Design a protein with these regions (language model features):
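N-acyltransferase acceptor-side catalytic subdomain
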Residues: 2-229
Length: 229
């Protein structure tokens, strides 16, 4: 689950190192061809159609680009993942969740979760969650592929997370909190009820100290591709 880095702003010399995919070509290069610097940049172009997005995630690839920039596709090595059973529900977090009285719901306000993720990141440093991205993932949500886990406080939406689900893997995209620990509460609920949701692995994409403190760990890209295959 990546943050708000303006990843699409790349030097021209870097863009010349990666292939360009025409919109009519529904395919990707092999992930072994991804660059080391920037880590995981594989190609540019294509589109955000449901068919292309599903193909991308099934191959361990995800889009990540800034608004107004070309679509960039990534498959970093190593990859940050979270095994639901490895989630660290520390005592302080457990007490905070209980004290605040959060309610967790799924797939009730998918677009709103994406918009919250976009607006909170925009306030900080710009966002990669553009209207184009929102529309693309809402289309996936309507197919039952993109999902959201939402945190409510006194009936109000105060945070959560969203991602793409293929098989037993949830490819996490972004998290948001309007009040302390709201996104962590959604993630904790997801991990605690992973069996019911039939989720065995959560892809966190790129390393963050925040997610690693919650139990996420790094695996090689090769291992990741094997796990999602």
């Amino acid at each position: 689950m990546h943050g708000g880095t303006r990843c699409g702003t790349l030097p021209r010399r870097v863009r010349t190192l990666i292939p360009w995919i025409p919109p009519q070509l529904l395919d990707f290069p092999d992930v072994s061809e991804a660059l080391d610097d920037p880590n995981g940049l594989l190609c540019a172009g294509g589109d955000l159609s449901p068919e292309r997005l599903k193909l991308a995630y099934s191959r361990g690839i995800f889009p990540w680009f800034s608004e107004g920039e070309p679509i960039l596709w990534w498959s970093p090595d190593p990859r940050l993942v979270l095994e639901p059973a490895a989630f660290k529900l520390r005592r302080s977090l457990k007490q905070s969740i209980k004290k605040q009285g959060f309610e967790i719901r799924t797939n009730q306000r998918f677009r709103d979760i994406m918009c919250l993720c976009s607006s909170t990141r925009q306030d900080r440093e710009g966002t990669w969650i553009s209207e184009e991205m929102i529309d693309a993932y809402v289309a996936l949500h309507e197919e039952g592929v993109a999902v959201s886990f939402e945190t409510y406080l006194n009936g109000n939406l105060v945070g959560g997370l969203y991602g793409v689900r293929l098989g037993r893997v949830l490819f996490g995209e972004s998290m948001v909190s309007l009040v302390p620990d709201a996104s962590k509460a959604a993630l904790a609920s997801l991990c605690q009820e992973a069996d019911r949701h039939q989720i065995e692995l959560i892809d966190c994409q790129v390393p963050t100290s925040h997610l690693q403190s919650l139990g996420a760990s790094l695996i090689t890209r090769e291992t990741f591709i094997e796990r999602i295959g």
